[in-house]
Amino acid sequence: MSEGSNSTSAAASTQRQVRVQLTSKQEDIALPENTGPILVPTGLRRYALSTLVNNLLGNDKPIPFEFLINGSFLRTSIDEYLTANGISAETTLEIEYVRALIPPLHIASFEHDDWVSSVDVLSTTSPAASLASATIAAGQERILSGSYDGLLRVWNMSSQIVATSPSAADGGHTASIKAAKFISPNSIVSAGLDRTVRVWKYSEDGDGFSGKIAPQLELYGHKGPINSLSVHAPSNRILSASSDHSIGFWSTKKSDAPAAPEDLLPSAALRSSKRRKLNSSVTIPQRGPLALLSSHSAPVSAAIFDSNDSTVGYSASWDHSLRTWDLVTATLVDTRTTSHSLLSLEHLPEHHLLAAGTSARHITLIDPRVSATTIAAMTLRGHTNAVVSLARDPKSSYGLISGSHDGTCRIWDIRATKTDKDGVVGESVYSISRKSLEEQGKSEAKRIGGEGVKVFGVAWDGTVGIVSAGEDKRIQINRGEGVLSSA
């Protein structure tokens, strides 16, 4: 008797149904507005739901979908979700569907002579072009790289070098470059171990195969290596993060900038007669900072502008703290102290969050608003070494890419979460390894700590894709159409 009742109960559970209202914020895949709630078995999982939506849309070629309930991805059956969240099957369940991840495939790798520390992209969709209302023709996108050999290079999409910055003798960097960005289609900024921020004029010949990176302005103020740069082109402003524990606030226009501190300028005694001779035709204006922001007690790894308000800046440091600055008055507004050294920083403005990569192998999402009651809103786990570079998904407010010394880049969707003893934890939705390992036949091999393949910099562009730079002396480009759903 009991066996029969058990089988009846199991059948009832299997046959249990729930009303679901399927919606999408993406117009091209949305169901008609008059589509009402649908009765479905609670045993359905993602694949069956995806089939259902494709049938309702009448798609000849199925589109893989992901499903969100209350802002989090469905990773179980509907029944398990209802049970875990104490929701009655009598309620109508709102389920949002979005396009599933398309793995970002390897497109190309550009080889260098030395480690590549930094990358940036110039395309119609990149900030440098869109803020300048410039149109970059398809196929004419450019990639900027900064290298440990002290040189900047601008590449075309066919892996050809269009332009290289001058050597130290001709007005270039005198040590390794750690950061490089396009300010506009004809302006570049870079910084590194020589403690200077340098602004360059970029121009191309009519054939599009050759160009010039010419020194335009040298900015002095830091007393230690510069680790990262952030640019706000409309206001002609730059932020720099330095190992001297300070943040530099600069103007890209020499007419706005104060005189450079005399004690930091290259001493005349250090200039050899050979260099003087070479430099006789190169006269580069030298200026100082608008302000040096000092409060951190250890090297500053990153400094960025608030995405919505360029008068606000944020900095992350090895001293474990995230600091908010009023850039108009050059004053400290707020300090958030975490448990680990912070090595990288990115703003997710739609969610009022800052993502900070840490020495403890994870990414902490921090709400910088004074009203926030907790420091860490969420933790993203998956890397096995320090997280040293972050970039926002240009097409989704939920997306983030991270570059790590473990030799991988990871794509995150902050809706892909689980809850454990440490609170809300995010899991990466895709991991990108270095193509150089695969070519050596070691794609499955685990490099201890990412030895030889550390990722130093990453950029995510809406046109070109994910561009990463590393210890393998390469820029690597990966692209997957609509990697995350937009929102």
From Swiss-Prot:
One of its GO terms (cellular component) is nucleoplasm. Keywords: Nucleus, Repeat, Ribosome biogenesis, rRNA processing, WD repeat. Its main location: nucleus. One of its GO terms (biological process) is protein-RNA complex remodeling. WD repeats lie at residues 126-165, 172-210, 221-260, 295-335, 337-376, 382-422, 450-487. GO terms for molecular function: ribonucleoprotein complex binding. Residues 18-99 are annotated as: Ubiquitin-like (UBL) domain. InterPro entries: G-protein_beta_WD-40_rep (IPR020472), NLE (IPR012972), WD40/YVTN_repeat-like_dom_sf (IPR015943), WD40_repeat_CS (IPR019775), WD40_repeat_dom_sf (IPR036322), WD40_rpt (IPR001680), WDR12/Ytm1 (IPR028599). It is found in: Nucleus, Nucleolus; Nucleus, Nucleoplasm. Pfam families: NLE, WD40. Transmembrane segments: none annotated. Component of the NOP7 complex, which is required for maturation of the 25S and 5.8S ribosomal RNAs and formation of the 60S ribosome. Component of the NOP7 complex, composed of erb1, nop7 and ytm1. The complex is held together by erb1, which interacts with nop7 via its N-terminal domain and with ytm1 via a high-affinity interaction between the seven-bladed beta-propeller domains of the 2 proteins. The NOP7 complex associates with the 66S pre-ribosome. Interacts (via UBL domain) with mdn1 (via VWFA/MIDAS domain). Belongs to the WD repeat WDR12/YTM1 family. This is Ribosome biogenesis protein ytm1. It comes from Aspergillus oryzae (strain ATCC 42149 / RIB 40). The lineage of its organism: Eukaryota, Fungi, Dikarya, Ascomycota, Pezizomycotina.
